[in-house]
Amino acid sequence: MSLSNSLGLLGRKVGMMRLFTDDGDTVPVTVVDVSNNRVTQVKTEANDGYDALQVAFGSRKASRVTKPEAGHLAKAGVEAGEILKEFRVTADVAGKYAAGTVVPAADIFAVGQLVDVQGTSIGKGFAGTIKRHKMSSQRASHGNSRSHNVPGSIGMAQDPGRVFPGKRMTGHLGDVTKTTQNLDIVRIDEARQLLMIRGAVPGSKGGFVTVRAAIKAKPTAAKGAN
């Protein structure tokens, strides 16, 4: 399924836990809260030049919303959300929803389905090349003097006389958008609108994530959990 026709859900990473399968195996899962995903706008080919659904998640104080945003949300009849995201979908999918509709998790996903989860990785501050780029340390002795954890040469001198763009060097580590692909859904708690996804997803507890159908792998049946 391509990104151009897949509707996803916005959520908040609750944390990690483990489930047990019918065979007694333990499965590490990440719990994602996808409750109250509401449609704020339905875009169509005729009006906007493409088909898409705009979805809001979370809640925000009215005092924190700009007047244009307040008018946009009032037109849809929904409360302000912490995050707003647009999903490109087909005309058939867009026709199933109207502004103000709450999208349940079971309408989009099923147990055993493979999904891609996008979030902001945990920021780790300023880091050296060994931690940031997985480079190797230099020799501990045998002629090495105070150059144990330095990256080494970063370019030539007179020609070209500069450091090429993209050279892996020290800098800020983390706090970037990351996507973990092909994770399967182990369980869906419809009462609390929770997705339990096998493995780890980007970000810290309480961070926002986007969950959508996997675009690269073929779906495979996952073992059911109790």
Curated annotation (Swiss-Prot):
Pfam families: Ribosomal_L3 (PF00297). The keyword Ribonucleoprotein applies. Residues 137-150 have a biased composition (Polar residues). One of its GO terms (biological process) is translation. It comes from the Bacteria. GO terms for cellular component: cytosolic large ribosomal subunit. Residues 135-158 are annotated as: Disordered. InterPro entries: Ribosomal_uL3, Ribosomal_uL3_bac/org-type, Ribosomal_uL3_CS, Transl_B-barrel_sf. Keywords: Methylation, Ribonucleoprotein, Ribosomal protein, RNA-binding, rRNA-binding. The modification N5-methylglutamine is found at Q158. Methylated by PrmB. NCBIfam families: L3_bact. Belongs to the universal ribosomal protein uL3 family. One of the primary rRNA binding proteins, it binds directly near the 3'-end of the 23S rRNA, where it nucleates assembly of the 50S subunit. Part of the 50S ribosomal subunit. Forms a cluster with proteins L14 and L19. This is Large ribosomal subunit protein uL3. It comes from Polaromonas naphthalenivorans (strain CJ2). The lineage of its organism: Bacteria, Pseudomonadati, Pseudomonadota, Betaproteobacteria, Burkholderiales. The gene is rplC.
